[in-house]
């Protein structure tokens, strides 16, 4: 039985939108939602690490490894000890590895142009800036997290034989997730129903 949900996905894949839909649909049943990206963006803006008027989003290198881990491990703690959370962040599915009762959802968009267009509309920036921001954040975040979470990758993913020790650290490997939704061919309403049906199927 699924007691919590994680939603992971790279920018433009629709993970934040899915969180918003699920919060609305599940609120009467006592579910709560948390967006790691929105929390970190507010923190970075408050501390002056990021100027929201500059367009685009910041990358994870603007704050310390310690703060990054603190926020992430708090999410893992919620998944281990609490119920009825929908946690959305780049790494939430990775943080849920080996935690029982968590439905791990990965949002993807197989059409890169569609992802870019969504970021353009979300951030009111040019397609060129959206592409550059998307690629820059991915490269910097992945490099940082591969270093910061190398031991957790070994403990949570390699040791349980989910992947080979020689495989590169890839937090968004589809085989680490319970549900993978391609929002290029699946609408947000359909995506919401897929998740709801997955939860109900185990009740």
Question: What spans do the regions from the language model cover?
Answer:
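Walker A (P-loop) ATP-phosphate-binding motif of ABC ATPase nucleotide-binding domains
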Residues: 4
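Post-Walker A helix-loop "phosphate-sensing" segment adjacent to the P-loop in P-loop NTPases
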Residues: 24-33
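ATP-dependent small-molecule kinase phosphotransfer cores
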Residues: 36-98, 113, 124-132, 139-141
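Hydrophobic anchor at the beta1->P-loop junction of P-loop NTPases
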Residues: 7
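P-loop (Walker A) phosphate-binding loop of NTP-binding proteins
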Residues: 10
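Small-molecule kinase domains that catalyze NTP-dependent phosphoryl transfer to phosphate-bearing small molecules
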Residues: 127-191
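Walker A/P-loop
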Residues: 16
């Amino acid at each position: 039985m699924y007691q919590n949900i994680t939603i992971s996905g790279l920018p433009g894949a629709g993970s934040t939108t899915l969180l918003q839909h699920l919060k609305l649909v599940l609120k009467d049943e006592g579910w709560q939602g948390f967006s790691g990206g929105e929390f970190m963006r507010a923190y970075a803006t408050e501390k002056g690490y990021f100027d929201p008027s500059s367009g685009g989003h910041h990358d994870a290198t603007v704050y310390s490894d310690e703060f990054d881990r603190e926020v992430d491990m708090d999410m893992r703690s919620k998944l281990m000890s609490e119920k009825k959370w929908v946690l959305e962040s780049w790494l939430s599915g990775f943080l849920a590895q080996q935690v029982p009762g968590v439905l791990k959802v990965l949002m993807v968009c197989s059409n890169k142009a569609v992802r870019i267009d969504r970021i353009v509309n979300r951030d009111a920036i040019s397609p060129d800036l959206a592409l550059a921001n998307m690629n820059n954040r991915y490269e910097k975040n992945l490099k940082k997290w591969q270093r910061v979470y190398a031991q957790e990758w070994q403990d949570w993913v390699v040791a349980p034989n989910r992947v080979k020790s020689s495989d590169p650290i890839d937090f968004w490997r589809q085989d680490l997730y319970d549900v993978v939704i391609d929002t290029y061919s699946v609408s947000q309403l359909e995506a919401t129903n897929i998740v709801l049906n997955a939860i109900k199927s185990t009740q």
